[in-house]
Amino acid sequence: LSSAASDVYKRQIRTYCADHHQPIPETRGQVVRCIFESLALRYRQVLENLRGLSPRPVEALHVIGGGSRNDLLNQWTANAVGIPVVAGPSEATAIGNVMIQALTAGAASDVVSMRQLINRSIPLKTFTPENVEVWNAAYLHFLQLA
């Protein structure tokens, strides 16, 4: 982001916090923390909605793409959702393209074999929930803000 765009986002975040009687982030680190905490709590909100649509339990959350490289966000997401977060692959789009080519060429027979190939080829990182009680309290507060 350009500096001007970044300033706009920071101003919007600070205004939202002030309007909702929340601590106003002043430093860059505080703004980033505010964003990451908000993302992690929003992921939980979406996950809870999705759980209501599926009869199967969700045992882990898989994060792919560029965001999967951010260990702090992945840990906070695991904390917020209360289940392990499995991060990676970061280049999911390119890998998906390669897997479709492998399927077409006969190197993979189905989705299961493609997943097995990816799991053997690309290291994934698992984040285990920590401080769940603190994050549960933060989530209840988050819901009151929405």
Where are these regions (language model features)?
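Phosphate/ATP-binding catalytic cores across multiple sugar-kinase/actin-like superfamilies
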Residues: 31-59
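A short small-residue
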Residues: 13-28
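Secondary-structure capping and boundary motifs in well-ordered enzyme cores
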Residues: 24-35, 65-69, 90
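Catalytic phosphate/nucleotide-handling subdomain of diverse soluble enzymes
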Residues: 49-130
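Short, flexible active-site recognition loops that position polar ligands and cofactors
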Residues: 22, 35, 123-136
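C-terminal domain-closing interface element
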Residues: 133-146
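Charge-rich, solvent-exposed alpha-helical interaction surfaces
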Residues: 12, 16, 138-141
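Single conserved hydrophobic/aromatic residue that forms the stacking wall/gate
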Residues: 1-5, 9
